[in-house]
């Protein structure tokens, strides 16, 4: 896999566009009883309820903390703008799911030379959502996919432009902080992966010294911890603003 230089692959871009429209259409499914499957309305209710709680200003407690993360905080302002409307919330979810796929298509465009492989990769990425038309599993799409795709696209752009510096690294950890806030386990994995990317670059940079490697590992370990505790702090600032005790790490 190499960074591709040729442009104007209009047929590939047309396929991206068609898939993007189909993905949005498939994910915009506000009728949670449409397939008459209990899992659909259970999944939809669980996800929306945790967002609606934050919209109403409820603090996170041991009984109200969502098992999927604290994504409700990132939905709070958009939900205020639409008055907590469920129909508009589904549109937001469809938009996020579509954005995750667009990021995946752009990663393919930046990193894969073969047109056939790019098309096959795009179809494969879209297949899970297109294959469950009318179904609900927001807990995976877009929930556990949006930030991995954003970070992967960001890394691909850095590779394309060779923008490797302190600030680009910190921007990656900012994305990881938001990812941890959104969904804890996914965000922590992304932060560790972002650290591993810089460590691997250190090892691949020709001659390297053990001192440089140790310093790189330590600096990025601190950044991973800062991403985690930054997200933890944001949750507790929200709780304190609602006159509720701070959450423990266990909560």
PLM features per residue range, with description:
Residues 92-95, 104-113, 155, 159:
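Transmembrane-helix signature of membrane-embedded glycosylation machinery that interfaces
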Residues 74-76, 101-102, 125-129, 171-177:
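Hydrophobic, membrane-inserted alpha-helices
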Residues 2-8, 108-116, 160-167, 205-213:
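Membrane-interface helix-boundary motifs at transmembrane edges
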Residues 119-121, 157-179, 208-218:
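Short hydrophobic alpha-helices at membrane interfaces in multi-pass membrane enzymes
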Residues 1-28, 219:
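Start-transfer (signal-anchor) and selected internal transmembrane alpha helices
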Residues 116-159, 182:
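Membrane-interface micro-motifs in multi-pass membrane enzymes
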Residues 23-72, 80-96, 103, 126-129, ...:
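Transmembrane catalytic cores of multi-pass membrane glycosyltransferases
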Residues 143-163, 172-176, 195-201:
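Specific aromatic-rich, kink-prone transmembrane helix
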């Amino acid at each position: 896999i190499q960074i591709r230089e040729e442009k104007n692959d209009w047929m590939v871009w047309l396929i991206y566009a068609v898939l993007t429209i189909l993905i949005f259409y498939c994910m915009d499914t506000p009728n949670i009883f449409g397939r008459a499957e209990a899992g659909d309305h259970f999944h939809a209710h669980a996800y929306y309820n945790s967002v609606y709680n934050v919209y109403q200003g409820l603090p996170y407690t041991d009984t109200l903390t969502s098992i999927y993360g604290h994504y409700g905080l990132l939905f709070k302002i958009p939900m205020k703008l639409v008055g907590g409307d469920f129909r508009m919330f589904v549109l937001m979810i469809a938009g996020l799911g579509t954005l995750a796929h667009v990021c995946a298509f752009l990663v393919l465009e930046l990193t894969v030379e073969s047109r056939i492989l790019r098309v096959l990769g795009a179809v494969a990425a879209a297949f899970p959502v297109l294959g469950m038309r009318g179904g609900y599993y927001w807990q995976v799409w877009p929930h556990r996919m949006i930030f991995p795709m954003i970070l992967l696209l960001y890394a691909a752009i850095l590779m394309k432009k060779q923008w490797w510096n302190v600030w680009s690294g910190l921007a990656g950890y900012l994305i990881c902080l938001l990812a941890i806030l959104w969904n804890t386990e996914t965000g922590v994995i992304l932060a560790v992966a972002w650290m591993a990317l810089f460590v691997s670059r250190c090892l691949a940079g020709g001659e390297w010294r053990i001192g440089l490697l140790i310093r790189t590992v330590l600096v990025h370990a601190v950044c991973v911890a800062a991403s985690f505790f930054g997200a933890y702090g944001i949750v507790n600032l929200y709780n304190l603003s609602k006159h509720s005790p701070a959450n423990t790490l266990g909560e």
